[in-house]
Swiss-Prot record:
Protein name: Origin recognition complex subunit 5
Organism of provenance: Mus musculus (Mouse)
Assigned GO CC terms: chromatin; cytosol; nuclear origin of replication recognition complex; nucleoplasm
GO MF: ATP binding
Residues annotated to bind ATP: 37-44
Function recorded in the entry: Component of the origin recognition complex (ORC) that binds origins of replication. DNA-binding is ATP-dependent. The specific DNA sequences that define origins of replication have not been identified yet. ORC is required to assemble the pre-replication complex necessary to initiate DNA replication.
Pfam families cross-referenced by the UniProt entry: AAA_16 (PF13191), ORC5_C (PF14630), ORC5_lid (PF21639)
């Protein structure tokens, strides 16, 4: 256990819970476990490390790689069949057309002597992609232990909550385990663990402390922070290498690295340039804004529905109001663009600038573009207020007017396209100027 804790830092409670769920090798474990948490919260790493360290038979499948249920089921079967084969290259690839075929083939694979008397684990990473496959797949995997009468546990790893998975018809409920975000103390401990051997642990820990002081408010992603730590460490060491400062001259080292980290917030975090381009920038002492190919917008972390509110506001600002029926109603009939054109509308709406729109139109568009129904709660209205505070929306006229406030969207086309990409929304299809 101590060896496992040294490999998996700051996840002792989750490791302990999983070990208690797994139990002894020959005991029947929980049929299905649903593990969720934000990106880079350690879900995949902890699960894989635990299964490998305990040497438990398992098949790990990334659902992103399997765009059909057939590919997914075949990959599970083939990985399990390789566990039986002494030489993985000699085993034949298995095929199955339906979930019923999968159940029968799974029984055959797990009847081998090596797998018969112990729990077999199937780990499905990026499990949210299962929702786009056949309706019977998720309920079937949740009840796989019952359907096959085998000692099997299916582990789902996802970034979204279980309530977004649960079918309307009902299903077997898995054991739900939450991986919270790493605290700043956790990140300090994990990142300090990666210190280069040529420098002392205290020196690298001081650097990580500075790095988190700058980036923690805008980025909690462990992978991003680890990337930033590796990328910016040579600049932090520069005064020490040149003999201008010692390892304990924290103030001098901070003054040297501070402008460098501020530039890093504007470029590398957005992945608008590669690491090699970033290093070249620092050698040439070039302003990041001068690099060809960079966009002008700045990065913001917005809540999920705030992104859709901003998209709806942009559509309301740049589309004529009477085109809403065309874009957001399913049965609008065939309408040609030329039927809408008047003399003053032949100019692009993007050249004329954003038009004001009422709140009810914004909400109507929002409900049309969001997949799941969004109730008009105080949370939605507070997010609109936040967007106004961030100056992404502006209020037109007086706030106390009787017929309700009107708004304008102030963001650029490049900015809104970047926001739309984050939520997989093709905004160009809904813009009147691009018909």
């Amino acid at each position: 256990m101590s060896h496992l804790e040294s490999m998996v830092l700051c996840r002792e409670a989750q490791v302990s819970t999983l070990q208690s769920l797994f139990g002894e090798r020959h005991h029947f474990s929980f049929p299905s476990i649903f593990i969720y948490g934000h990106t880079a919260s350690g879900k995949t790493y902890v699960t894989q490390t635990l299964l490998k360290t305990l040497e438990l038979p398992h098949a790990f499948v990334n659902c992103v790689e399997c765009f059909t249920s057939r590919l997914l089921l075949e990959q599970i079967l083939n990985k399990l069949s390789h566990l039986n084969s002494s030489d993985a290259g000699c085993s034949t690839e298995m095929t199955c057309e339906t979930f019923n075929d999968f159940v029968q083939l799974f029984k055959q694979v797990t009847s081998a002597e090596h797998l018969k008397d112990q729990t077999v684990y199937i780990v499905l990473d990026k499990a949210e992609y299962l929702r786009d496959m056949e309706a019977n797949l998720l309920p079937g995997l949740l009840r796989l232990q019952e359907l096959t009468d085998r000692n099997v546990t299916v582990i789902f790893l996802s970034e979204i909550i279980w309530e977004k998975f649960r079918p309307n018809t009902g299903c077997f409920e898995p054991f739900v385990l939450y991986f919270p975000d790493y605290s700043i103390g956790n990140l300090q401990k994990i990142l300090s663990h990666d210190h280069p051997p040529e420098y002392s642990a205290d020196f690298y820990a001081a650097y990580i402390n500075i790095l988190l002081g700058v980036f923690y408010t805008v980025c909690r992603d462990l992978k991003e922070l680890r990337h930033l730590a590796v990328l910016n460490f040579p600049k932090y060491c520069e005064p020490v290498v040149k003999g201008e400062a010692g390892e304990r001259d924290t103030r001098k080292l901070w003054r040297n690295i501070e402008p460098h980290l501020k530039k890093a917030m504007q470029t590398v975090y957005l992945r608008e340039i590669s690491s090699s381009q970033w290093e070249k920038l620092q050698k040439d002492n070039t302003d990041p804004g001068q690099l060809k190919g960079l966009s002008a917008y700045t990065h913001m972390e917005l809540p999920y529905y705030s992104k859709f509110i901003l998209i709806a506001a942009y559509l309301a600002s740049y589309n004529p109001a009477r085109t809403d029926k065309r874009f957001f109603l399913k049965h609008h009939g065939k309408i040609k663009k030329t039927n809408f054109l008047k003399k003053h509308e032949k100019t692009s709406n993007h050249l004329l600038g954003p038009k004001p729109f009422p709140l009810d139109r914004l909400l109507a568009i929002l409900y049309s573009i969001v997949d799941s129904r969004v109730a008009p709660t105080a949370n939605i209205f507070s997010q609109i207020t936040s967007l106004v505070t961030l100056q992404l929306l502006t209020i037109v006229g007086h706030e106390d007017q009787l017929n309700g406030p009107k708004y304008k969207c102030t963001v650029s086309l490049d900015f809104i396209r970047a926001i739309a990409r984050m939520v997989n929304f093709d905004i160009i299809k809904y813009l009147y100027d691009f018909l």
